[in-house]
UniProtKB/Swiss-Prot annotation:
Comp. bias (Basic and acidic residues): 67-80
Function: Plays a role in limiting the replication of viral DNA in keratinocytes. Recruits the host NCoR/SMRT complex to viral replication foci to mediate repression of both viral replication and transcription.
Gene Ontology molecular function: any one: DNA binding
Protein name according to UniProt: Protein E8^E2C
Disulfides per UniProt: none
Lineage, uppermost ranks: Viruses, Monodnaviria, Shotokuvirae, Cossaviricota, Papovaviricetes
Amino acid sequence: MKLTILTKRFRSSSPLRTSGSPTDTNPATQGQSTQTARKAETKGSRHHPKSPAVRKRRPYGRRRSRSPRDTTLRRGEGESARASAGSGERVAFISPGDVGTSTRSPPKGGQSRLRRLIQEARDPPIICLKGGPNQLKCLRYRIKASNSSDFESISTTWHWVHNKCTDRVGHARMLVRFISTEQRDRFLDKVVVPKSVSVILGAFDGS
């Protein structure tokens, strides 16, 4: 009977632990639980990465405004200024003495209006040979056979006529056209012109 009573007292003296009891107050146990909670949060953040930031796009329809300098350049200056500023193109102006030194028309496309006008200002250089008809015909035959690369084209012999009739006036004439004044000078250096034939330098106003 005494043994049974002692056992009951021992059981009743031990503290009862229920599900609603407070957490453990041991510092070591609390540290382990804190580390476990941090690891769980870290794993959760790895499985759920942050979504990338969305860039805002500019609304359509907006254009970059032009500076006053660009507007002045487009309105005030010509095509030559735009060409030299944009592509580095240099336009070589010609002197009055170079007018009439080209035999071919410039191409229509691929160049500025100023460059085309400068090229059109160059007219083909010529020489006018004046003498007897037979002398000029023999000279034409000789230079076509020996100096064909030193001129562009050559005419037949011709005469001026009177303004009121068809009578011929003066000596016969023949024209020789060149690409440049350099070619004409080279022609005059190579070709031997008879003393009875006069040489007159000139240029066409156009080709």
